[in-house]
């Protein structure tokens, strides 16, 4: 297994050296850089990534593409703001709806139609009249997360109720995740849109993700024009990771800690090249 891992990493590093193209790293946050926890507010990046990310931005482009709000990401990655970098470093929140530099000085937001935001508020009102006491309601500003990690048995009735409501509230979509349903405006961008845009700046990319929201990126990087110059790494939880993700990645790790070791190994090979 380690031989196979080294072979894949070495092939990517050697190809990067041969063509002389710049390399960028793109990471999801929850489940990728940070272990999944029962309460979203308690999620924190694995400590192994602190020195790794410092090392990355000293030599490579870095992007964090997450479903989290940009304010949350700015807080999590503020330790990088004091480090000078000559490379592109950008945070993308709400799947790319908003983005920022590390200092929060240049926050940009895409336009969400007012009608969709009104429907989102109507969904909130309908939720208040429902009785799912086991569900933690997360207000993310331009989307809502309905977390049922404490009661996985209600996934089916909760999902059915959300689908029923969204059938009446045209302009909203449901995004399933690990023990969560996210309700968002239909015009909210997806991660693959953001990554596709980033690839126009950084031709060779290492992407790591763990959930349904990352599936589009894994599929994108499988396309012929990307597969030879990109490396996709899945962080898999055997009980929660969708099968489709395992079928579309180049490498699979079992935890954020293991991912950190793989990235460290890859950085060593890239530095040699």
How does the language model describe each region?
Residues 1-6, 20, 185, 192-273:
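Mg2+-dependent phosphoryl-transfer enzymes with acidic/Ser/Thr/Gly-rich catalytic loops
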Residues 1-29, 33-38, 48, 55, ...:
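Non-catalytic pre-domain segments flanking phosphatase-related domains
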Residues 14-17, 78-85, 222-228:
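Alpha-helix termini
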Residues 25-27, 91, 206-208:
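Residue-level marker for buried hydrophobic side chains located in beta-strands
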Residues 36, 44-137:
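Active-site phosphate-binding/coordination module
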Residues 61-63, 90, 145, 206, ...:
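A structural signal for isolated positions on well-ordered beta-strands in alpha/beta enzyme cores
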Residues 81-98, 168, 245-260:
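Structural recognition of alpha->loop->beta junctions
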Residues 130-221, 228-230:
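Conserved acidic, metal-coordinating active-site core of Asp-based
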């Amino acid at each position: 297994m380690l031989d196979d891992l080294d072979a894949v990493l070495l092939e990517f590093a050697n190809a990067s050296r041969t063509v002389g193209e710049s390399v960028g790293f793109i990471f999801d946050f929850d489940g990728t850089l940070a272990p999944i926890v029962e309460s979203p507010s308690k999620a924190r990046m694995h400590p192994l990534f602190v020195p790794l990310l410092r090392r990355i931005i000293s030599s490579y482009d870095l992007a964090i593409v997450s479903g989290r709000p940009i304010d949350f990401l700015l807080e999590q990655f503020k330790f990088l703001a004091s480090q000078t970098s000559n490379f592109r470093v950008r945070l993308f929140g709400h799947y790319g709806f908003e983005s920022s530099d590390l200092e929060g000085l240049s926050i940009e937001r895409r336009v969400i139609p007012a009608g969709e935001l009104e429907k989102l508020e109507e969904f909130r009102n309908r939720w208040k009249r429902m009785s799912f006491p086991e569900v933690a309601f997360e207000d993310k500003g331009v989307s809502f997360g309905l977390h049922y990690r404490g009661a996985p048995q209600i996934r089916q009735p909760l999902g059915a109720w959300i689908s029923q409501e969204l059938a009446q509230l045209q302009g909203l979509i449901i995004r399933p995740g690990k023990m969560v349903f996210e309700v968002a405006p239909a015009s909210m961008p997806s991660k693959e849109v953001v990554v596709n845009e980033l690839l126009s700046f950084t031709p060779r990319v290492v992407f790591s993700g763990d959930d349904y929201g990352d599936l589009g990126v894994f599929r994108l990087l499988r396309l012929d024009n990307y597969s030879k110059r990109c490396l996709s790494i899945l962080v898999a939880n055997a009980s929660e990771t969708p099968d489709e993700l395992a079928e579309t990645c180049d490498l699979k790790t079992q935890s954020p800690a293991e991912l950190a070791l793989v990235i460290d190994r890859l950085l060593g090979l890239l530095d040699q090249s």
